[in-house]
Regions:
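Glycine- (often His-adjacent) and acidic-residue-rich active-site loop
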Residues: 61-106, 155
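Crotonase-fold acyl-CoA enzyme core
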Residues: 108-224, 251-264, 270, 277
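Short beta-strand->loop
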Residues: 238-242
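Short, charged, surface-exposed hinge/linker loops at domain edges
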Residues: 228-237
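Short, active-site-adjacent cap segments at secondary-structure transitions
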Residues: 64-68, 126-127, 231
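Conserved CoA-thioester-binding segment of acyl-CoA-metabolizing enzymes
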Residues: 1-64, 78
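Terminal peptide-recognition signature
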Residues: 22, 26, 41, 59, ...
Length: 277
């Protein structure tokens, strides 16, 4: 990336009917994500967490061939801090720091976002791109889409949090099969395994995603967000600790405007009108 280059069109953003749409716009590069697009995605998910005007997030990509083929390593990251003249080209620990500040942060930003995140899977998701699918809350896939755990096929080990996410979705033995062999996984097979929620014709992907996203965006946002956190924590906490967290969140949720509206609408026998707080 040349100094001063305008890269704003490589990640398209818009908010429509309470839905934040994020579109990776690098179809000519397989929608691979360079560091500056990755960092914008991290910021977008973190900001969506706090933004009362955003009540659901959709992540998709341009074109119909690739959703995301992982990190674009052809774009070098800028050097952070100072560099003495006698420093080696590659300092021990630099890869660790790059991982921690990179796709691992992106995975965490998606998982920790209070708002529900839908991936509209428009094509191939490979390597780190598959993490974006696994980290999302819901996935709608075009019928021509596929996922590839390409790491071992290139002599690499899975990164970007894939080893954390994949077995939680498909189970340990199936996760090992997918990672050890790196075979293509069709959208239909991904749906059978529970990675994908719904498969639709490619021409219907945007409309199907819009329907789900706007349905979520018109729902009780806090209740959805706290439900997301409980489900994520269920595989991490002991039974005792999870039940304690559940009780605390139920208590907090009863103080929301939407919780009060839910009770009132039930008593008054009318549809609820959710505000999102």
């Amino acid at each position: 990336m040349s100094e001063g280059a305008d890269t704003s069109d490589e990640l398209l953003t818009r908010v429509e009917n309470g839905v934040l749409w994020l579109t990776i716009n690098r179809a000519d590069k397989g929608n691979a994500v360079p560091f500056y697009v990755r960092d914008r995605l991290i910021d977008a998910f973190r900001n969506a967490h706090w933004d009362l005007g955003v009540r659901a997030v959709v992540l998709t990509a341009a074109g119909d061939r690739h959703f995301c083929t992982g990190a674009d390593l052809s774009v070098p990251q800028p050097q952070r801090g100072t560099r003495p003249d006698d420093a080696p080209e590659r300092v021990v620990g630099s890869a660790i720091n790059m991982m921690r500040a990179g796709f691992q942060q992106l995975m965490t930003a998606i998982q920790d976002c209070e708002k529900p995140v839908i991936v509209a899977l428009n094509g191939t998701a490979a390597g780190g791109g598959s993490m974006l699918v696994l980290a999302a809350d819901l996935v709608i896939a075009a019928d021509n889409a596929k996922l590839i755990q390409v790491f071992v096929r290139r002599g690499l080990i899975p990164d970007a949090g894939v080893a954390y996410l994949l077995p939680r979705v498909v189970g340990m033995h199936k996760a090992k099969e997918l990672i050890f062999f790196g075979d293509d996984l069709s959208a239909a097979d991904a749906a059978t395994l529970g990675i994908v929620n719904k498969v639709v014709p490619a021409a219907e992907l945007q409309s199907a995603t819009k329907e789900w996203a706007e349905r979520l965006a018109s729902g009780p946002t806090k209740a959805i967000g706290w439900s997301k956190k409980l489900l994520h924590d269920a595989s991490e906490l002991s039974r005792h600790d999870l039940l304690e967290e559940e009780a605390m969140m139920v208590e907090l949720n009863t103080s929301t405007e939407d919780s009060k509206e839910g009770v009132a609408s039930f008593r008054e026998r009318r549809p609820p009108e959710w505000k999102g707080w």
